[in-house]
Amino acid sequence: MILQNFFCFWLGYRASGYEPLEKEDGALILVNHQSFLDPLLVGLPLHRPISFLARESLFDVPVVGWILRKTHVMAINQEAPSTASLRETIRALHHGFLVGIFPEGTRTPNGALSEFKPGFAAIVRRARRPIYPVGIAGAFQALPIKSWFLKPTRVRIVFGKPITVEELEQFSRRGHDAALIALVESRIVACCEAAEIWRTSGRPPTTEK
């Protein structure tokens, strides 16, 4: 509650469209990656935790690796997820947990959406769980790369309409990864655009993205 109050005051934090996730029995949350704040910002309006995936190399960084392990973050190679990491992720989903993934694999260097890494497609194929696209706007301005000071600026989060298991069925076999990635990217882009409009104009989303 303290953290939520701080973000609402300092960043004018607002989120939209997250309510369906409160009752979702296991789902993937795919988000654009703007800053180190992103896992906190995405999870803030929810009354349940999100287990985010982070690149394996971060677990070797002193202090950072310890924090990641203590906050239930799971390690993954974005280019080619190992069998063990895939199994752990899918087990969490099948036990009803929310799992967050940054398809870009790393934070944006300039605020724009970066190219998606293909590794998340393998998780989507095997998990058979809905995908919730999420767009963040303003976090890059609040805490860009190499910055250690949180700047007071508006941050908006838009949770989009889920991509259902039925919709994902057509991508269940290998060879369809490019089409799957394109679909996910288009949904995240729509959420990012809605979040940016909300951030700059003050107009909240009127329809699900």
Task: Map each language-model feature to its residues.
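Catalytic core of membrane glycerolipid acyltransferases/transacylases, capturing the structured
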Residues: C8-F9, E22-A80, E88
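Non-catalytic C-terminal accessory region of glycerolipid acyltransferases
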Residues: A84-K209
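Residues at the C-termini of beta-strands that transition into short coil/loop
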Residues: E19, E56, N77, G135, ...
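Short amphipathic alpha-helical segments and helix-helix/interface helices
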Residues: L3, V42, F120-A121
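N-terminal nucleotide/polyanion-binding subdomain common to many enzyme families
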Residues: M1-F7
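Membrane-interface helix-loop junction between the first two transmembrane segments
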Residues: R14-E24
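Secondary-structure boundary/capping positions in well-ordered alpha/beta enzyme cores
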Residues: Y13, R48-P49, M74, G96, ...
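Short gly/ser/thr-rich secondary-structure transition/capping motifs
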Residues: C8-S16, F140-A142
